[in-house]
Amino acid sequence: KKKSGIAMCVGCGSQIHDQYILRVAPDLEWHAACLKCSECSQYLDETCTCFVRDGKTYCKRDYVRLFGIKCAKCNIGFCSSDLVMRARDNVYHMECFRCSVCSRQLVPGDEFSLRDEELLCRADHGLLLERASAGSPISPGNILSRSFHIADPVSVRQPPHRNHVHKQSEKTTRVRTVLNEKQLHTLRTCYNANPRPDALMKEQLVEMTGLSPRVIRVWFQNKRCKDKKRTIFMKQLQQQHHIDKTNLQGLTGTPMVAGSPIRHDNTVLGNPVEVQTYQPPWKALSEFALQSDLDQPAFRQLVSFSESGSMGNSSGSDVTSLSSQLPDTPNSMVPSPMDT
């Protein structure tokens, strides 16, 4: 905190009277003895990198060790030149990107799964699934085959198979109606809008399709029956999938494909703050006075003149009289306006 231009140390909270003030971006000021790493107590200045986190200052080494990204396998940090592999939010060294069972290194293009933060190649993941599901009544392979059977057309239109032979007199000839694409499209559109059409809608369908009312009635009955069976079957599959997933005890991982290694970016660590050295304006005059043979009374008058800030209010004759008492200054020293 600053009070009327007075520099206050962030570390100890007292006013800074030192020769140097260390300023940490954006507006933090420290004693030179107070600005040090909170972990290793290394003094920090403008010659090293300083990090500030949660009000504490750290050197670069400790900041990377505490807050830097580490390999999910060996728990060691990365260098700026390291190539890394990523799986979800985990980052790995290329040498650490291996199957946790067979230790085979995964290369770009390999399929793998991430289970309990462990990498598994496709072969080992399949073996674990087979072992875990060995005692279950329905294996994952059977579930897949059943789900594939849903897409197959249901053979409702096929004539039923007779196990016994009827007499010739008992046989009845039934005409099988074959619907074309236009008729099917019309019936399906109406079914999606209303699975149970009323008499008026059925009459309109008779005119639009050219089918008999009986055929239309039977088609809607069969369609509702098939949809009901399909809904029940899907519900049973979901329940069985939930049971198998519980029996696997978390062995189901997320299938992934290894990508190409990328260069590790150190910018995730955050931008280091800048430490600047501040030197009061009278310091240069003080050092010059110690190295030169100056008239001490005249020098004290000059210092008090610069500290009082009355240079702008003094007359030109006073400045001339003071400067005449000083020896010739080197050409490298260029006067600049004083800070107030």
Swiss-Prot record:
One of its GO terms (molecular function) is DNA-binding transcription factor activity, RNA polymerase II-specific. The keyword Repeat applies. Keywords: Developmental protein, DNA-binding, Homeobox, LIM domain, Metal-binding, Nucleus, Repeat, Zinc. It is found in: Nucleus. Residues 307-340 are annotated as: Disordered. Residues 9-62, 71-125 form the LIM zinc-binding domain. Its main location: nucleus. Binds to one of the cis-acting domain of the insulin gene enhancer. May be involved in subtype specialization of primary motoneurons. This is Insulin gene enhancer protein ISL-2B. It comes from Oncorhynchus tshawytscha (Chinook salmon).
